[in-house]
Amino acid sequence: MESCFPAMKLNQCTFGLNNEIVSERVSAFWGTQVVKPNHLRTTKLRSAPQKKIQTNLIRSVLTPFVDQESHEPLLRTQNADPKNVASIILGGGAGTRLFPLTSKRAKPAVPIGGCYRLIDIPMSNCINSGIRKIFILTQFNSFSLNRHLSRTYNFGNGVNFGDGFVEVLAATQTSGDAGKKWFQGTADAVRQFIWVFEDAKTKNVEHVLILSGDHLYRMDYMNFVQKHIESNADITVSCLPMDESRASDFGLLKIDQSGKIIQFSEKPKGDDLKAMQVDTSILGLPPKEAAESPYIASMGVYVFRKEVLLKLLRSSYPTSNDFGSEIIPLAVGEHNVQAFLFNDYWEDIGTIGSFFDANLALTEQPPKFQFYDQKTPFFTSPRFLPPTKVDKCRILDSIVSHGCFLRECSVQHSIVGIRSRLESGVELQDTMMMGADFYQTEAEIASLLAEGKVPVGVGQNTKIKNCIIDKNAKIGKNVVIANADGVEEGDRPEEGFHIRSGITVVLKNATIRDGLHI
């Protein structure tokens, strides 16, 4: 089904999928997982060689008078069961850092990778992890997000969840003083819907995942939950090494030798930032990488024991509104809060710059992240579009999505979204084009051109570089978008664009007149 197929990736002289490069790293801190029967699973830290001991011999020595066949092994670890896990995906705030892409949509609804939306990342990770009890909390500009979720993840014509469910919980006002306010933060959003865990559908839930709707990564959440169970944690925070240039944008933490978090600071600055430096070689990083990434950053992905989450939100910290800046730092001193090292690609799509870079990085060889994985596909709305039609084009290191028309144009290091139309002479370089929500017929296009109007797509002989083109944009003939003056920040909404971090952003449904130079 098209809903789980990625867009077509085109490289110079290469038309097809690339072999995925898989690597593993053994951590001196976290150890390597020993494969044993499920009832006898443990973790072995890297240390001096140890002699193997028969576990049944240990039992015969320690319990010589016990009937072995009538008792469970002493070394028993509970296995994580996805049926006992529920996930809550946060729809995000107003998304001011991603403006203007969030002017008419929620952050998780922002298109990415040619044919996906950001919400598809945590949703697909949940599905691939076997988690079928999913709540999505929405508030700001949630129309397109709700529409995408209803079209994609439902029982009728989307992904089949069996006995699971996907519930979209939109912010609403209820009786009482607290119910008269909108969400005040991530924790407050969950608090206002905490009653869902009293519902019959969640009676067997033991652990609750808190996920963000604006991150790009692939993760098996059940490995995360298993670590949470094995460490007997009340809360587990997924984390990764971070360099100094971006450390102040994240929650930072310090851990002890057992992986327990002993200090947590949300987005520290100045001296507070320096105080959070640690020797990340404890995570198994080589000395050079440890020196380059002297911080441990929270991914904003948490798992709570359900009863602990309810207690924290209801009674322990009833006025705390945010997980990262309030709940987690307060809980560190009173609860067993553990760290889980995620040693793979992860990107916070929080700014125009990071969004732009993460998209274009998908075209690189080899990419740090890719949607091409048969075992863990990413799902999206089934649009049933035809293949892309390419006529005498030059395409290098790019991704071209479904249902596009490309005529005698050049596309280099760019992403071309669904239903895009590029006319002859167009040059697209270092550009993320989101595509369109609809087609215009040849007759409609001819009529618009005859009237001096601009159809959806990119007109003849237009040159575009270092740009994000939002959906349904109409860009005329002989236009040049290159930010030749090197403007870092600029606002020209009356002409259909803004500039953020030196990147030109053409607005959704905007019209760029013929011959305009930006």
Swiss-Prot record:
GO biological process entries: glycogen biosynthetic process; starch biosynthetic process
- Pathway it acts in? Glycan biosynthesis; starch biosynthesis
Q: Quote the record's activity regulation.
A: Activated by 3'phosphoglycerate, inhibited by orthophosphate. Allosteric regulation.
An example Pfam family from this entry, by short name, is: LbH_GLGC
Q: Which GO terms describe its cellular component?
A: chloroplast
Q: Where are the Phosphoserine modifications?
A: S424
- PROSITE patterns from the entry? ADP_GLC_PYROPHOSPH_1, ADP_GLC_PYROPHOSPH_2, ADP_GLC_PYROPHOSPH_3
Family statement drawn from the similarity comment of this UniProt entry: Belongs to the bacterial/plant glucose-1-phosphate adenylyltransferase family.
Q: State its role.
A: This protein plays a role in synthesis of starch. It catalyzes the synthesis of the activated glycosyl donor, ADP-glucose from Glc-1-P and ATP.
Q: What is this protein called?
A: Glucose-1-phosphate adenylyltransferase large subunit 2, chloroplastic
In its UniProt entry, the species of origin is given as Arabidopsis thaliana
Q: What is the lineage of its organism?
A: Eukaryota, Viridiplantae, Streptophyta, Embryophyta, Tracheophyta
This protein's gene is called APL2
